[in-house]
Amino acid sequence: LEKSDTLLVIKDVHTYYEDSYVLQGVNLEVPQGKIVAILGRNGMGKTTLIRSVFGLTPPRSGLVEFKGNSLTGLTPFRIAQMGLALVPQGRRIFKNLSVLENLQLPTSGLAKSKVHRRTEQNIDSEWTTEKVLDEFPQLRDRLTNGGNELSGGEQQMLAIGRALVANPDLVLMDEPSEGLSPRFVLHVGEIMKRMRSLGHAILLVEQNLALALSVADHVHIIASGRFVFSGTPEELKSNPDVLDEHLGVSSAKALDA
């Protein structure tokens, strides 16, 4: 990879969560405009990896770089200003705010400089509240509704939309398909492909194997804090033993669907 094409570099990262040694020497790169998926059973370190990048659970040692700048010691707020956005597990929208208020939050001060910088580069790829509502028409019908009045699928749309209006270079997505109907899962997959086509990179943590393999350019499987497989979706599909051992037989069967 050309260095200029690599947005995120994770080098020999070791992260502890309370007293647990969770990430045990993880190495990862996310190129610009690519989707990199992290798969693995529960408790293997997927969410901790996302938290380590976003400054929520800083690594004990190792390097996390974004666009050539170290993220060590930076707050999540500062990291967001640099062009990262997080769609957290469980959605975490502001349920006491309306849909419109949720969408306006990222541009109300969080990353105005970031938004303006990207606008100058390419105004056509700029995500606005209007463009997000075009992408998620269900939200347009619920603009004045509180976040607590939305279905799970609508809350996930809002969480993704809220990330997009900050116009990030890289979006960290933690289990975006969790609790969604199959129809919404397909929609989330289409949205991720569209984000990639507009130049966004995505680091995706996902339990839904079929979704991850349908969108990812590169896949890593994590087990006990280390990557036990790294390759393309096609390479993973041709390794049923890896699928069985690290993701379970049902996951391998799901690929036949």
Give the positions of each predicted feature.
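The feature captures the beta-strand-to-loop junction immediately N-terminal to the Walker
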Residues: L39-R41
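Conserved ABC transporter NBD signature motif
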Residues: G62-L71, M82, D124-T129, D134
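ABC ATPase C-loop
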Residues: A163-L164
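Catalytic Walker B motif of ABC-type/P-loop ATPase nucleotide-binding domains
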Residues: V171-E175
